[in-house]
């Protein structure tokens, strides 16, 4: 978890001094999975955002639309695919965990397709839940249930967050897996617990990409790769993009940071497909570092959720504006006018 940020901080810039220093960058645009974005970053998928603020993913989609950047909806959203689609005004993607197994996954894919998602993002690194010790300490489990036991275990956290408590109470402490609503398997409607069970029993494999490709008419992207051999396998499978990610360090502690993995994967995959990265992105300068190392764009995870928790939709909008402004400022100080001028020659790695 810590290495995602630590490895970003090890990178230092080598600016080009001259006539371009301080001049407004003329081109911060990027084509990401075939859609134009005014800036080289997007909102990444985060589960249970409704537990942070009642606005949840709807607020995130609205904020992304204001800036014109893509938004990726998590299967673990507290709002339905259709609710988020109605709020989105920029291209949006759907991140797939096959809740309910293959049958449930097919239903979610069909709904996302009908609602207008342009890209299907299949997360490959969650074959079993990670051992998240903090969650275990305060009794968190899936699906989220707020009762006397969980409130007691979380009391020391809640008592210092009166604004959060007020918002959650007004939302009646609803943290649902909204996209399992109405899901069926073998003709029977599934409860949330059952949908989760079948996902764990039938996690996605490389072979599943075949039927997903047959059902999905848009871009097919795999997320959660940190191994160069897996990147080659993804290319062989015919994917349209790769998201380099160690799941925020929340799955397997000793995986390399996303940035370190990007160094290995980008040279292999970026000549063929768009390569994105997430993990530790907190500043616009972090986005620029990722672009210098071959990423097409970066995804925000915790950063946008911090804004959501602090101020709902307006909080997310403010975070996106901060990231955008920092990208522009960093480019000015580096002496580049276009995203296309960013490369490894502008970076050096601290030796410690």
Task: Map each language-model feature to its residues.
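An N-cap/entry alpha-helix motif that binds or orients negatively charged groups
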Residues: 1-34, 139, 143-146, 151-204, ...
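Glycine-enriched alpha-helix->loop->beta-strand junction motifs that scaffold or abut catalytic
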Residues: 66-70, 86-92, 115-118, 215-219, ...
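Hydrophobic faces of well-ordered beta-strands that scaffold small-molecule active sites
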Residues: 41-44, 71-73, 92-96, 120, ...
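Alpha-helix-loop-beta-strand connector modules within alpha/beta enzyme cores
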Residues: 82-93, 201-220, 253-277, 322-330
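N-terminal capping/small domains of soluble enzymes
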Residues: 1-128, 323-325, 342-351
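Alpha/beta catalytic cores of nucleotide-metabolism and tRNA/nucleoside-modifying enzymes
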Residues: 1, 6-9, 257-277, 282-352
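Glycine-rich beta-to-alpha transition loops that act as phosphate-gripper elements at the mouths
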Residues: 55, 75-78, 99, 203, ...
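Conserved, mostly hydrophobic/aromatic
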Residues: 43, 64, 122, 212, ...
């Amino acid at each position: 978890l810590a290495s995602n940020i630590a490895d970003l901080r090890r990178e230092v810039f080598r600016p080009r001094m001259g006539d371009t220093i301080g001049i407004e960058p003329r081109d911060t645009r990027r084509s990401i999975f075939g859609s134009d974005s005014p800036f080289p970053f997007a909102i990444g998928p985060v589960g249970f955002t409704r537990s942070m603020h009642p606005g949840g993913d709807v607020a995130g989609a609205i904020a992304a639309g204001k800036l014109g950047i893509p938004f990726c909806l998590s299967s673990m959203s507290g709002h339905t695919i259709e609710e988020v689609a109605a709020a989105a005004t920029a291209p949006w993607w759907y991140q797939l965990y096959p809740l309910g197994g293959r049958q449930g996954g097919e239903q979610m894919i069909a709904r996302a397709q009908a609602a207008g998602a342009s890209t299907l993002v299949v997360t490959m690194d969650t074959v079993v839940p990670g051992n998240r010790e903090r969650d275990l300490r305060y009794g968190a489990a899936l699906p989220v249930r707020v009762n006397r036991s969980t409130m007691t275990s979380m009391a020391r956290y809640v008592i210092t967050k009166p604004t959060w408590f007020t918002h959650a109470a007004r939302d009646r402490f609803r943290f649902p897996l909204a996209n399992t609503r109405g899901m069926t398997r073998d003709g029977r409607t599934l409860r949330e617990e059952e949908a989760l069970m079948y996902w764990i029993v039938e996690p996605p494999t490389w072979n599943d990409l075949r039927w997903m490709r047959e059902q999905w008419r848009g871009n097919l992207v795999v997320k959660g790769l940190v191994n160069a051999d897996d990147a080659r396998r993804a290319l062989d499978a015919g994917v349209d993009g790769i998201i380099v990610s160690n799941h925020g360090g929340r799955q397997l502690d000793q995986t390399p940071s996303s940035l370190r993995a990007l160094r290995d994967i980008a040279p292999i995959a970026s000549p063929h497909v768009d390569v994105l990265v997430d993990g530790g992105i907190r500043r616009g300068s972090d986005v620029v570092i990722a672009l210098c190392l071959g990423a097409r764009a970066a995804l925000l995870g915790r950063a946008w959720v911090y804004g959501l928790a602090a101020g709902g939709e307006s909080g997310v909008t403010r975070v996106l504006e901060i990231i955008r402004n920092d990208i522009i400022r960093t480019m000015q100080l580096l002496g580049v006018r276009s995203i296309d001028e960013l490369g490894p020659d502008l970076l050096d790695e601290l030796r410690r």
